């Protein structure tokens, strides 16, 4: 007896590629046939409606009605055949898709037995990193928003202080610093007036010496 051939990795890859290619190819072929049948059925429906209108028309002769009735029966029979064909194609598409999926699963199982690390499992660590990175972005946005609000408040306070200074100038006509300067100059004048080196103090000293 001949020993059964062992499947190598290349044969498994070929079977896997064949199954992956067969699923969309068979489905597109079957759906195309169904669309053609639906287009033919639309023509049948329109002809059947026109035949029914002829039958309901009172002016139609008896011979014309008999002819329309025969044509209508033929249309209905063809409609029945096409409808059955459409349902058969749909059932065949379901069966062939199921068989292709089974082939695909069989290839996957063989691949996993031969190459345990062939299919990389889904790891949720990436999702965890995304979840941890989102709050960091949110905290940065909040910090930027707080800094921007603080800058806006500081600018508003500076603007209000400048407005108060302008209001003082318009009310008094001069700044408070000028008033302080005038007060200091008056004090200086009083000091000079009562200083021993002033002209009045020297005149008093001379009159005292003469006496």
Swiss-Prot record:
GO cellular component terms, A-Z: chromatin; nucleus
Bias (Acidic residues) ranges: 178-188
GO biological processes: transcription initiation-coupled chromatin remodeling
Low complexity bias locations: 195-211
Region (Disordered): 155-211
Short name of any one Pfam family annotated for the protein: ING
InterPro entries: ING_N_histone-binding
Superkingdom in the source lineage: Eukaryota
Protein name (database record): Uncharacterized protein C16E8.12c
Organism per entry: Schizosaccharomyces pombe (strain 972 / ATCC 24843)
